[in-house]
A protein has these predicted regions:
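A generic structural signal for short beta-strands and their flanking turns/coil linkers
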Residues: 23-25, 160, 312, 330-334, ...
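Short acidic/His/Gly/Ser-rich catalytic and metal-binding motifs that mark active-site loops
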Residues: 114, 173, 324-327, 391-393
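Gly/Gly-Pro- and Ser/Thr-rich, intrinsically disordered tail segments characteristic of DNA damage-repair
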Residues: 1-256, 263, 404-461
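Core structural elements
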Residues: 103, 310-324, 381-393
């Protein structure tokens, strides 16, 4: 069996961990530069706020209704996500982190039985006096209580509410987690372990919300009169093959209980991107743009090394706003291919900067009546790494001038120091020190778990 642990309204839940006064109150989290709503608590959803609502349009309404507003605090969210994943690793030897707030894990009766036996020896009344033998006679009770305990323990230890789905496939487990999140009667865990439960769950689940069903496929299914996951799952395999691609066929098989995505099958990213929109009127200083691109390239290489990969292709882009008619428009978008695949940040940063400098516009000397400011105001920039392959084995070059072994040790040392003492402890000079391209985050909460200056102060009197 496969389980999925899904954090409920994750960003909002993170903001509530150190603000218990917000429990039961509406909360929203804003995107980069406080642009739009990207996360809502259940109370905020009940007030009618939608994902993607432009902040400037709903700001007055949010304030009038007493909604707590937060800028996105990704450092805090990442730290709490790591705590949740660490907790999950205590319950299952194999976990697959799917996103910052979701993780698949292996779940079976024998594992749950061993777990309960170990814990009931220390806490004999922990499970309402139901013995292990009695639980073993009711496998559904065993697995359900196993999932419910995971949900309860993560909430108690980390402060993040999670919903658990347990089923035979990853797709069914995701559906189970949705039911566990929506209906409190499941006690944090929805178990789909029989055909009867599977069909009942699918009959209540909209087909457009199924993992793996995109918008175009959903529209096509709707045109065919298929509105629920059960209607789709009940179709014959030959019909699915004749109308859809192999990816949709895999989803159909998963809905019918045939596992097509194993617990260890995490597809390696085909590309890695780090980008950012800049606040206010954008950036006009070439040095600041270079600093930003260097930082984005470093972030990409960190992700690359974390997944044990190297890359050969690099793309850099930057553009001005299309909506500001008072300044000139300009777009940078170019790529290059390295001779040897690498994950060393000095190589990738150097390549990214060479692209930017080669394409950066020359200053415009003469102004126009409709455009008095002739400087280029860049509103967004980013770096994309592609042609990604595993670090081992790596194609070598007999005439490579770089000592790859020495370079790898250097990267490992930098990563270790930055993990221990915080991001940016060791950095390249081109990255700067004062982050002159930082986001607009007026409603930013503190970094309670990673910044010693933001640690909560407890009054003892």
């Amino acid at each position: 069996m496969i389980g999925l642990a899904d954090c409920n309204n994750f960003y909002c839940s993170c903001e509530r961990v150190f603000r218990p006064d917000l429990t039961g109150k509406p909360v929203v989290v804003l995107s980069n530069n406080d642009g739009c709503v990207i996360a809502r608590s259940e109370e905020a959803k009940a007030l009618g706020y939608k994902m993607g609502d432009p902040f400037y349009q709903v700001k007055e309404k949010l304030e009038a209704e007493g909604v707590a507003i937060f800028s996105s605090n990704y450092t805090l969210y990442g730290s709490l996500s790591n705590r949740v994943m660490s907790m999950l690793s205590h319950y299952s030897p194999r976990i697959d982190q799917y996103s910052i707030d979701e993780s698949f894990f292996e779940a079976d009766e024998s594992m749950a039985k061993v777990f309960f036996r170990e814990h009931t020896e220390d806490h004999p009344t922990l499970f309402n006096k139901m013995t292990i033998d009695e639980l073993s006679e009711k496998p559904d009770s065993l697995l359900h209580r196993y999932g419910s305990k995971i949900s309860a323990d993560v909430l108690r230890a980390v402060g993040i509410p999670i919903s658990v789905g347990i089923a035979e496939t990853k797709t069914l487990a995701k559906i189970g987690s949705k039911f566990a999140k929506k209906y409190k009667g499941f006690q944090g865990c929805c178990l789909i372990d029989t055909d009867e439960r599977r069909h009942k769950a699918l009959s209540l689940f909209p087909v457009e919300d199924v993992w793996g069903i995109g918008r175009q496929i959903a529209r096509k299914l709707d045109y065919m009169g298929i509105r629920t996951a059960a209607q789709f799952a009940d179709k014959k395999e030959s019909w699915v093959r004749s109308h859809f691609n192999i990816t949709t066929l895999r989803t159909w098989k998963e809905l019918n209980g045939e596992s097509c995505i194993s617990i260890e099958e995490l597809p390696q990213k085909k590309s890695i991107c780090t980008s950012r929109s800049f606040a206010n009127e954008g950036i006009t200083d070439k040095n600041v743009i270079e600093e930003a691109v260097a930082n984005f390239a470093v972030r990409c290489t960190e992700k690359l090394r974390r997944q044990g990969s190297v890359c050969q292709g690099i793309t850099v882009f930057a553009w001005t706003s299309r909506f500001n008619g008072h300044v000139p428009e300009y777009t940078i978008h170019d790529s290059l291919t390295l001779p040897i695949a690498t994950n060393a940040q000095e190589e990738i940063v150097g390549a990214a900067l060479s692209i930017l400098r080669a394409k950066y516009p020359k200053p415009m000397a003469d102004s126009r009546p409709d455009c008095p400011d002739m400087s280029f105001h860049f509103k967004k920039a980013g770096v994309i790494l592609w042609q990604i392959s595993p670090d081992h084995p790596r194609q070598q070059d007999l005439f490579d001038p770089i000592d790859r072994s020495k370079q790898k040790k250097l990267m490992e040392a930098i990563d270790a120091i930055n993990r221990k003492y915080g991001y940016g402890t060791i950095r390249q000079a081109i990255q700067g020190t004062d982050c002159r391209f930082d986001l607009k985050r007026k409603y930013m909460s503190k970094q309670f778990t990673t910044n010693i200056h933001d640690i909560l102060k407890v009054k003892t009197q």
